Amino acid sequence: MTLLGQNVDSYLWYGGGLKKDFNKATQMAQATAVNFSQLLEKVALKFPEMRIRFSTSNPQDMTLDVVRTMAAHSNICKHIHLPVQSGSNRILKAMNRQHTREEYMALIDNIRAIIPDCAISQDMIIGFPNETEEDHKDTLSLMEYVKYDFGYMYSYSDRPGTAAGKNLADNIPETLKSKRLAEVIAVQRKHAAMHTQNRVGKIETVLVEGVSKKSEKDLMGRNNYNAVVVFPRETYKIGDLVAVKITDCTSGTLLGKAISHTKLSS
């Protein structure tokens, strides 16, 4: 089960109405309101044998209550998609993002203090208008600090109707965008390879999602950290929870051998 939203951490249910009007609600409505960490816990308790994910979290709204709820329940995946967009405060301000580099890094530290091996993924926009080489280096250094498990990286392009598209000239040459994007991707691949290598030899609980694209003799699924795991099909099928011993890896995929069926509570 995936709890999905553009910004799931801003979820607040108090019987109906907009979040901005919460202070106008009755005392009873406010006292019985449900925020995202509470919703996540309710779902985890209701479906103990169902794997639960959520996405996406915005850094300014991500609370440590959510992280503590993740840590408390084995059926909540230990992965947070936490878009940062840039490692430069100057560019973040130009993007109208509501977090700074320092606030983001502090959030990462706090997440890992609660769940040390929590997988963290990112979105990154490269070549935003007026991005300097120093801004680009700030992005690379942030990536080295966080060491993301995986990410989604794109070069900037004008989008009609956006504030940037209306007010900022797309003034970074495409060749320079491509160069910087390649450097960002290289850093991400290095960190992804490190994370997958660290899982070799471990036993992972894998939820089978389908047949491997490379061979019908293999199945693929994801572990508790949202990493793709491929293993021989044998008698297992889509929807099974399988204990898989990881024997090898690529930069983005874990390879293994099935041991047995398993349960999230085991």
What are these regions (language model features)?
Residues Q6-V8, Y156, E234:
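Short, ordered loop/turn segments at secondary-structure junctions
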Residues S37, E41, M105, K137, ...:
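Generic alpha-helical structural signal
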Residues L82, D123, M143, G151, ...:
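Hydrophobic, well-ordered secondary-structure elements that form the walls
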Residues R51, H79, F150-S155, T253:
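Residues at the N-termini of beta-strands
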Residues A164-S266:
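Terminal RNA-binding accessory module
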Residues E134-S178, V184:
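C-terminal, non-catalytic macromolecule-binding modules
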Residues V66-V67, T139, F231-P232:
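Short beta-alpha junctions and helix-cap segments that line functional grooves
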Residues M1-E133, E144:
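Conserved SAM/AdoMet-binding glycine-rich loop
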